[in-house]
């Protein structure tokens, strides 16, 4: 079980972008997307474990990680505002978004990328705590992030783009991670509902559905052991053949940049009339 981040970016060229932006998919989105389309960012991150006082297989993000992301963005010649915020904390998210827009001027693009991963239990054996943390972060956290941002997009009067990070697990089911699957399916419902309601403001809403991504949420001791319980000390090379079985393409996982490229498309003018789309970046996983 681990917590990840959320971030918000202000884009001078195409507006402002909100996304999960401190390492992994979020870091790639922050660095690749805005680098191509604008020059201002707002990044928020939990900067700590999702469950304080506990150790997890996946290292929790830190204030230093967020500062490093900010430095990388600044090195690209862009402005960035950061805040340590948990997406479960709506007042905190709203305050960060409001402050960022006040400092940077506008909001046109939202990428709701924050989320956690856990697994191993059958759904009927999942603890109440694990269920609540998953839904509160991966579903309610997405809703809270978009809720905080939408008034700024509407008031700008320019339309905009909202991109929600779901998962292949938001399009199909897998055993032993039912709370994750339920939350990610819920993200699709959020995407479609926001899309129906916000279309009148020329705000497009879409979702991206990654398969395994080569980040710390996949490459960690707990996941290695989950995929290869037959080995005493499994590593990524031991897990790769199992991961490849999920795909029609002969690869075990995709890279964070593959996700940021999909996000960049949805945020761009090339997708100006694209809304309500569930886009798998899955190496053919949905075909199996």
Question: At which residue positions do the language-model features occur?
Answer:
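Substrate-binding pocket helix/loop in short-chain dehydrogenase/reductase
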Residues: 121-123, 127-135, 243
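Short, small/polar-rich loop/turn modules that mediate ligand/substrate recognition or access, typified
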Residues: 199, 204, 274-276
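Short C-terminal tail/terminal secondary-structure segment
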Residues: 120, 172, 250, 263-264, ...
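Residue(s) in the substrate-gating loop at a strand-loop-helix junction
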Residues: 167
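Alpha-helical segment proximal to the catalytic Tyr-Lys
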Residues: 151, 196-197, 272
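Active-site helix of classical SDR
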Residues: 146, 183, 191
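Glycine-centered low-complexity coil/loop motifs and glycine-rich tracts
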Residues: 4-34, 40-42
